[in-house]
A protein has these predicted regions:
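Short, compositionally biased
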Residues: 74-90
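Residue-level hotspots at or immediately adjacent to binding/recognition sites across diverse folds
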Residues: 63
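N-terminal edge beta-strand
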Residues: 28-60
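Bacterial N-terminal signal peptides that target proteins for export
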Residues: 2-12
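Extracellular/periplasmic metallocenter environments
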Residues: 88-130
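Short proline/glycine-enriched turn/loop motifs at strand-loop junctions of beta-rich domains
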Residues: 66-71
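Bacterial N-terminal signal peptides
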Residues: 12-20
Length: 130
């Protein structure tokens, strides 16, 4: 009798875990991420084609300078305040993969960052969803 109850209990726990994992997988919808295009406006200010980007842990984000190859920087205030495993990257193309743990306390987590071209800065954000 105890063996039967133990198997049933294990089955219940396994089913609950599978359902929870399924709900988590559905919560963060993966999309074919297009690169974020970085340009410079007539006023010299950096511009991006999306001011707010929603991503999942494990997604790869890529910024590309549109136009003549030009260096730009993606900067976060600190490594702890970055959804990536880096604080700053510079180049004509910048790529980062959203790290595990970027979602804090199981809640949607917003990260402000700077796009810097020369001395001009723009401050969009990345939102990481569970």
């Amino acid at each position: 009798m105890f063996l039967h109850r133990s198997k049933l209990s294990g089955l219940t726990v396994g089913l609950a875990l599978a359902l929870a994992m399924s709900a988590t997988a559905e919560a963060c919808e993966r999309a074919d991420r297009q690169p974020i295009m970085v340009t410079v406006g007539a006023d010299g200010m950096p511009e991006v084609d999306t001011d707010s980007l929603t991503v999942c842990e494990g997604d790869t984000v890529r910024w590309i300078f549109r136009g003549t190859a030009r260096q730009f920087s993606i900067l976060f205030t600190s490594a702890e305040d970055s959804p990536f495993d880096w604080k700053q990257q510079t180049g004509a193309t910048v790529t980062g993969t959203v790290r595990q743990g970027a979602v804090k306390d199981g809640q949607e987590t917003s990260y402000k960052y700077d796009v810097k071209v020369g001395e001009k800065t723009l401050d969009p954000k990345i939102i990481v969803v569970p």
